[in-house]
Amino acid sequence: MAPDPQNLESGNSNHPSQQNLPIADVAFTEAVTQIEVLDDSEVAEDEPDDMPTIVLPMHLSNLDDAAKTDVGLQREHNEDYYGIAAEIQQIKKPSGGSVQAQGIYILCDGMGGHAGGEVASQLAVETLQNFFQNYWRSQRNSNATPKIPPSQVIREGVLLANQVIFDRNQAEERMGSARMGTTLVMAIVNNTTVAVAHVGDSRLYRYTRKNGLEQVTCDHEVGQREIKRGVLPELAYARPDAYQLTQALGPRDNEFVEPDIHFMEINEDTLFLLASDGLTDNQLLEEYQNNYVAPLISSQANLDQGVRELISLANEYNGHDNITAIVIRAKVRPNLESIRF
């Protein structure tokens, strides 16, 4: 559960002290991978890296997901909420199978008294699902090939969700700690392109065999804000309000909300993990990634069971908050049909 929505820069929590650098935007529309063609007789350790390369486009061979939410051990109500809407089409050819996929994966961690957090998180998820489903529907109706929404469209959707919650606060005359709000982390998948948007401290991680576990999002909290201003991390997180949110959806109008939006290409088998802070607190995922995250990238791993085990792990070592996880597993292979020899 996120802190008091009325004063987003006061209070404390239990988060890891670390600097997070979001992954840079990319402009590719098709994932590619590079293969170096080397003559074994010419390979040497001091050889310059100027060998010819073949750039292979990649396409999805499979996309699946699993999700679960849990109230935790100390909360009476679950203020987390998530939503998944995915359309996956199998394509079979003599050269091998592939899939075309569009998916919207949303996780929100609500806050606010008198059931406000539960209402806010659900409002945000449903508003965003409807917005992006309508966006893709309009593309199909105009006979356009559905593409990943551009950053301005994603921002429009996030601000719409903020406005819906803000208007509810105003209509119900909610004040102080009763004012409802929510964090947001969202992944939008269109084949091998992924857009990530977030507000608050709910996170998205990416796991690959090459790079291991990477935190893609950067928490919107006082400590991270101070680090971006040049303050040393150890000083930034010595503040009593270091873990307090600097923005959330709902408590304030759109002038105070600026979602972070990034684009990525899937060019190798990848696992995406969306998580509320009940799962990410105390470096839990970083500490246990080898046993609880890494195995899930295998096609043989049961994602539903893996998510249940992540929830159990969080209850064992955290348990102080609601816990929610969404896992997305993307498998890719080279698109050899696009290669001309």
Label each PLM-derived region with a short phrase.
Residues 1-341:
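PP2C/PPM-type serine/threonine phosphatase catalytic domain
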